[in-house]
Amino acid sequence: MPRKPRHRVPEILWRLFGNRARNLNDAIVDLIPNRNIQPEQCRCRGQGCLGCSSDKPAFLLRSDDPIHYRKLLHRCFVVLHEQTPPLLDFSPTSWWSQREIVERIIEMMQSGCDCQNVICARYDKYDQSSPILELLTSSSWEFLLKRVGHDVMVYLLQQTSIFLPLLGKKHQQVSGPPLCIKHKRTLSVHENKRKRDDNVQPPTKRQWLSSAVDDCPKDDSATITPIVGEDVDQHREKKTTKRSRIYLKRRRKQRKVNFKKVDCNAPCITPSTNGKVSTGNDEMNLHIGINGSLTDFVKQAKQVKRNKNFKFGLSETYSVIPPNHILKTLRPNCSDSKLLMNHIFGEVNVWSTTPSHGKGNCPSGSICLYHSLLKSLKNLIGKTKSSHLKMLLDKHCPVLLLQEDALKSGTTSQSSRRQKADKLPHGSSSSQTGKPKCPSVEERKLYCTNDQVVSFIWAICRYIVPESLLGTTHQMRVLRKNIAWFVSRRRNEKCTVNQFLHKVKPSDFPFFARKELCCMVNGHELQSESIRSTQQMLCTKWISWLFLEIVKKLVHFNFYATESQGGRLNIYYYRKRSWERLISKEISKALDGYVLVDDAEAESSRKKLSKFRFLPKANGVRMVLDFSSSSRSQSLRDTHAVLKDIQLKEPDVLGSSVFDHDDFYRNLCPYLIHLRSQSGELPPLYFVVADVFKAFDSVDQGKLLHVIQSFLKDEYILNRCRLVCCGKRSNWVNKILVSSDKNSNFSRFTSTVPYNALQSIVVDKGENHRVRKKDLMVWIGNMLKNNMLQLDKSFYVQIAGIPQGHRLSSLLCCFYYGHLERTLIYPFLEEASKDVSSKECSREEELIIPTSYKLLRFIDDYLFVSTSRDQASSFYHRLKHGFKDYNCFMNETKFCINFEDKEEHRCSSNRMFVGDNGVPFVRWTGLLINSRTFEVQVDYTRYLSGHISSTFSVAWQNKPVRNLRQKLCYFLVPKCHPILFDSNINSGEIVRLNIYQIFLLAAMKFHCYVYEVSRFWKLHPQTLFKFITISVRYMFRLINRRVRRINTGSSFRPVLKLYKEEVIWLGLDAYIQVLKKKNSRYRMLLIYLKSALSKHSLSQQLSSELRYATDRSNSSSLWKLNY
């Protein structure tokens, strides 16, 4: 028996309204009162209706009902408000049509001054039309009216809030009071899921915006065994309930208050104790958020976060420790050692009555823990003042020189190293320094490796920290591994202090295992259990302080941490001197198109300064502007909304532009269908791939303004709506602009919706926004010609090009090159097509297939395909000459053609990819296009430059093992495009090969994720097998959803010839082949996977398509990836 499908209420409606939000089918059934009457006594006179039916759901929805009616009942949701009166009367008949009912309800509400209902928005009395009216009068609603009657329909439209499905996970409100959020509330982790039990009361801390929602228990389906040191785990305090995150300004204010509290107890403690360095290094890329004092680290889950944006840092100083660090502000004496002890361990009751002595010795001559700590901390403060610390930085992380500077400084560096060989501090050896080295590297690889950074940090710890405070030899190895784990974290990853304490056992610190906590005074005695507990607490606090105040701040102060253009999520650590040398060399290239302005002009335009950062890449650095602060301006939103509206309504203005793979699919598929319809198979195809050289920087600003002015209308009217979004922890409202197109049956978003993957509700209150052409030209002109940036004390203004990273940059670039294509390229291609036809006719050859071509461009990447070799060759040479009027020239090194050029007598196929199976491919925007059959695959060669683990991040603070099930499904989403599965483009073998390759990459990511998580948790094979099978089954639903929901217009329909059993078999086989290389780690999991694969029905007799998909030679690039 097939499982009954679940029709769940969207999360956003469930959070706001709870059980009062239901789908239309359930809401109607609950509205009808239960009357035990015979059909002959009912108003229907025995004909049968919803009121007298014994099975109301079966009467409302029948097996022969149309699909659009079924979708309406299940995907439309209704909210019954608390004070709504019940339905008193029911009549199965209707005297009016659905349109007449909706029109009369709207006119009645408007005449009664009740225009707050969403159903009245944008209603035109003269035309008697509105977008919402059209939605509520479709054939599905007419069909529903015949089933429920007049009274139920009027009640639904007047007394309830109705939400219709819009696009993806979005819904649009079409009746009821406008949905709004008065207060933004943050939810705890366990509140994300719902529980349908009405008897359970929600917790008091969970306060919803409009109504309370029942709480739910945690999902403990994943069997997890934590791997933590027993001694530490037994004495850790329980976590407090997670509180809502307050705003940034209030958090900063709270830090100051916390600092004042700590400062009262320890006058010498500086602001650095709260984890914030005030020497200007707060602009460094590695931000570590620690709130509150360090003494209560166990109660608060402090998080270390890798920020997304990075800024330029200051120059290096002689010291490797921040000048306002607490160790730099104290002196190596007894009184300052006590201040440091209180700062690290807080107030210990046993030590409060301890007598103070000038030298910090025990009065009885014994050695207690208190006085031993004073001596050790005194040595720690003294070692911090040493001048040898800078030498450790130069030794372990040398300043890497550029190629032209290496020869000049080689002799000098050798002599200086010989002189300093005898002065190296602890951790150095003469054998390591016997061979002089000249740190010369390739020109762009100036960063320090993670091993070098870890080596430097550990050398500092070994030098300044007394050996007794680092524990045994085994414990030292544990600490170094934890430091290495922290340094290797990727961008956007957060980690807690408890993860720094992984495998740290107080029993391995003999220093803290002394029998006496302090000298016994006045007969003061403690029980052995209390002494042991206090000793373990002191050891744990010491290790936490070591990581937070030494390790974290050494990385923060001495390195410039940033991401790279090709490094994905990895973080690269630059010595500040190396970074300054790289920037000083590349700054002249990065400032092409900028001119220096005087201070007076800069002072007047100081508010228009642009934030920027340098992003390392393979051949230099890229200057990326950060316009996140200016994105809030209304003028920028209006300009973006108008340009987006033009893109939707007038796509011809943008020429051959495509904006994503789905857009490429919509343009490509009709062309291929047309070619195959002429002869039944594809003719020989000739490709030309080109890339515009400095596409953004070479744009002529005057020409661009003229192009924009040529197609702008005098005035634009946009609809202003609200988008109520639902996140994992909170709900919020975004203001959006929607195209005012009366001919459209659904709203088209003209402003970019930043959270389009989340569940949201569109609320239209009928507000309009008017934008004039004159204002648009002023705003665009200011964005182009008044873009000012500051470098050191100099100010520069951009006079050429478009700033990269701006919200409008991509659209403006497409409009610019679209005008070039309509003016120069399209006429040239038409002439070339005529010349080719005339040559064929002059040769008296029968023209079987007329010349056909297609030109596509993704921002600055051109793809041209033609059935004529001469036309492709002429277009190739035209691109090589460039377009001087538009200052547009192609990058000579990125041309790619699949034919031999007659003039050059060679095939320019340096960018062609040929796999182990011998099939040639053309690379274009992350895709591999078969140059013979035009079949499309994903280009996985871009992953060859790094490790697979650099492509994802781990949410350490949100129980990553529980998230593994969802993560495995997310691994499948990025490469799942309809163009890969449509049989109009790809054959059955390539469709299954694309699915198999997606599974291969997901399996590699699965191994990397499990390897990361297994450091702290033990994952059972049965749990992993369960997660894998869920993701494999999810793949088939994902493919069907993507292919079914893509909007292709009326030109063609996608064709999917695929079975669920084939997808499951491909997924299981892909995981087996990938995990076989890690057999020792996944021995039991492989047994489960092989057993499931052997029981599969397709394993008995494989089709030729499945054999082709699993052939290793067809996926040669994937098997070369490093995982």
UniProtKB/Swiss-Prot annotation:
Its EC number is 2.7.7.49. It is found in: Nucleus; Chromosome, Telomere. Signal peptide: none annotated. Residues 596-929 form the Reverse transcriptase domain. GO terms for biological process: telomere maintenance; telomere maintenance via telomerase. Residues 201-210 have a biased composition (Polar residues). Keywords: Chromosome, DNA-binding, Magnesium, Metal-binding, Nucleotidyltransferase, Nucleus, RNA-directed DNA polymerase, Telomere, Transferase. One of its GO terms (molecular function) is telomerase activity. It catalyses: DNA(n) + a 2'-deoxyribonucleoside 5'-triphosphate = DNA(n+1) + diphosphate. Residues 191-242, 410-439 are annotated as: Disordered. GO terms for cellular component: chromosome, telomeric region; nucleus. Its main location: nucleus. Component of the telomerase ribonucleoprotein complex. Interacts with POT1A. Telomerase is a ribonucleoprotein enzyme essential for the replication of chromosome termini in most eukaryotes. It elongates telomeres. It is a reverse transcriptase that adds simple sequence repeats to chromosome ends by copying a template sequence within the RNA component of the enzyme. Required to prevent genome instability induced by breakage-fusion-bridge (BFB) cycles. Can extend completely non-telomeric sequences using RNA template in vitro. In the absence of telomerase, telomeres decline by approximately 500 bp per generation, a rate 10 times slower than seen in telomerase-deficient mice. This may be due to alternative telomere lengthening, a process which is activated in early embryonic development. This is Telomerase reverse transcriptase. It comes from Arabidopsis thaliana (Mouse-ear cress). The gene is TERT.
